[in-house]
């Protein structure tokens, strides 16, 4: 226990005093501090669960409490948020509410509760507060104690700021936000036209570059992005018009190729079949449990006809021919069928849909 405490103290001190630092620099300073096994500390650091340390876009590490001290991030309050005392965190507040993942920042400076909640994950708490899932932003929300926003005098459309002070996180009602003079331009410089950046990391990098950034309230990050022709999806930042779907598809195919030692074409075929399996799973979830699989299949075929997607089914038939390779057939099962019966049922539905479109060898596989 004492050794773990010493490592925590060492990481906090090293990054607070000398960050941002590369992992090699951290390891060297840990050794100088008397930590016997720097590699073990670095492994714990990479998990991002024990300490409020995070990486910049260049992979250097920073101590967030030091980097964000005195900075304020704003969010324009939505109607549901005003009613239910919560603030959507993505993208406006992500850079600072990351701190809420750590116990000491799970409450505001005044002692009131503040925690990140997700629809479908924090169901019991949301039900207790009478908050419907659809009111929660997909990226999550910072849930405040009832009456917090009313006490602040904040209503729908108002700007609310979250600032890190020496006492912890505090909420501020923002009257008029100042003009952004550098952050938007710096974020535009940080994004790669071919690869999105992790959004909070880009903002933290901008904070390292400009010690004055966000020390006074400016417009919400969402609005700053719009002003500079940038776009975001979930936690990712990219130039306007970036094709996130194609990027995710390529990444997933590369992962499958690496995981199973596949050539690129086989990885594309496998991932396309996995995505079709996901579609079948969603279709089954939305279907009456008493409906027979063949009825579900008929519904899927009817939907394909109504939406003009016969060409897609034909294309997937071509890809399904890859199942003539026993290895790909085995990998499809491994990637889609879990411990529940839903995965197997969806796979059966997928097989039945593809059967008329694929060669006999693939049907046998």
Summary of predicted features, one role per range:
Residues 1-7, 36-80, 230-247, 255:
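Charged low-complexity interaction tracts in eukaryotic proteins
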Residues 31-40, 209-216, 355-357:
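Short, basic interhelical loop/turn and adjoining N-cap
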Residues 64-126:
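Extended boundary segments
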Residues 1-24, 183-211:
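Positively charged, polyanion-binding regions of nucleic-acid-associated proteins
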Residues 166-177:
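Short, Lys/Arg- and Gly-enriched loop/turn segments at beta-strand edges
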Residues 314-365:
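Extended alpha-helical scaffolding segments
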Residues 25-31, 202-204, 221:
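A short acidic, leucine-rich amphipathic alpha-helix
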Residues 123-143:
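Short, basic/aromatic beta-hairpin or loop at an interaction surface
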């Amino acid at each position: 226990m004492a050794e773990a405490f010493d490592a925590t103290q060492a990481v906090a001190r090293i990054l607070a005093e000398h960050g941002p630092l590369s992992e090699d620099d951290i390891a060297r300073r840990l050794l100088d501090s008397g930590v016997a096994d720097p590699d073990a500390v670095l492994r714990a650091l990479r998990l991002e669960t024990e300490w409020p340390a995070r990486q910049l876009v260049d992979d250097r590490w920073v101590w967030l409490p030091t980097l964000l001290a005195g900075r304020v991030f704003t969010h324009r309050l939505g109607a549901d948020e005003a009613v239910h005392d919560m603030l959507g965190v993505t993208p406006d507040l992500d850079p600072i509410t990351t701190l809420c993942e750590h116990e000491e920042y799970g409450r505001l400076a005044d002692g009131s509760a503040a925690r990140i909640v997700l629809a479908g994950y924090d169901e019991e708490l949301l039900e207790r507060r009478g908050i419907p899932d659809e009111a929660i932003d997909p990226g999550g929300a910072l849930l405040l104690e009832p009456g917090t926003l009313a006490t602040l005098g904040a209503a729908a459309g108002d700007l609310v700021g979250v600032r890190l002070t020496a006492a912890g996180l505090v909420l501020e009602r923002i009257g008029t936000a100042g003009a952004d003079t550098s952050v938007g331009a710096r974020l535009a410089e940080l994004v790669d036209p071919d690869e999105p950046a992790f959004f909070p990391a880009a903002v933290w990098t901008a904070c390292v570059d400009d010690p004055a950034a966000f020390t006074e309230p400016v417009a919400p990050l969402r609005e700053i992005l719009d002003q500079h022709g940038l776009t975001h999806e979930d936690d990712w930042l990219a130039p306007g018009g970036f094709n996130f779907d194609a990027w995710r598809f390529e990444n997933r195919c590369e992962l499958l190729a690496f995981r199973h030692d596949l050539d690129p074409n086989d990885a594309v075929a496998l991932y396309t079949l996995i995505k079709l399996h996901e579609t079948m799973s969603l279709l089954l979830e939305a279907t009456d449990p008493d409906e027979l699989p063949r009825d579900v299949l008929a519904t899927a075929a009817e939907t394909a006809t109504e939406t003009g997607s016969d060409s897609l089914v034909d294309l997937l038939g071509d890809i399904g021919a890859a199942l003539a390779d026993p290895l790909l057939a085995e990998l499809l099962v491994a990637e889609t069928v879990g411990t529940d019966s839903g995965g197997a049922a969806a796979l059966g539905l997928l097989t039945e849909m593809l059967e008329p479109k694929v060669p006999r060898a693939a049907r046998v596989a």
